[in-house]
Design a protein with these regions (language model features):
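Short, well-structured beta-strand/strand-turn elements
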Residues: 50-63
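Residues that flank catalytic or metal-binding motifs in active/ligand-binding sites
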Residues: 61, 68, 90
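Conserved catalytic cores of phosphodiester-cleaving nucleases, focusing on short active-site segments
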Residues: 65-76
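Catalytic cores of nucleic-acid endonucleases
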Residues: 76-105
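Short, Φ-rich (hydrophobic/aromatic) sequence segments
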Residues: 5-11, 47, 97-105
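Interdomain/boundary linker segments immediately adjacent to catalytic/signaling cores
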Residues: 1-41
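N-terminal, helix-rich and Lys/Arg-enriched segments in bacterial and organellar proteins
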Residues: 27-29, 60, 105
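Amphipathic alpha-helical segments that form well-ordered structural scaffolds
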Residues: 42-50
Length: 105
């Protein structure tokens, strides 16, 4: 299962930069948790648009991605600690994403 290909990574990189620019342009201060949720949503969309057979339901009660019927969850963190909500312990596959923001973001 290869859901994170070069097209997905490039799409995520570009859209994350655009979103962070919007935050800055409008003077929005986001917490790491907010940014993690937004990056997760951008990754869901990037996978859905670039991987055949991938669907991003965008509903909390569903997995982040369904890939040919298989549940895939996305976890994002600005650090090394992984937290999750009500549905974070679903069986299935997981994609773990860590990120670091710097002055270029």
């Amino acid at each position: 299962m290869n859901l994170v290909n070069e097209a997905v990574i490039e799409n995520l990189r570009e859209n994350t930069k655009r979103l962070l620019d919007v935050y800055e342009d409008f003077g929005l201060n986001k917490t790491p948790k907010n940014i993690s949720e937004d990056i997760s949503g951008l990754l869901e969309t990037a996978i859905e648009r670039n991987v055949e057979g991938a669907i991003a339901p965008k509903v909390d009660s569903e997995p982040d991605i369904r890939y040919n019927g298989t549940a895939v969850e996305i976890k994002t963190s600005a650090g090394t600690n992984w937290r999750g909500g009500t549905f974070s312990k679903r069986p299935g596959y997981y994609i773990f994403v860590t990120y670091e923001l710097d002055e270029n973001n």
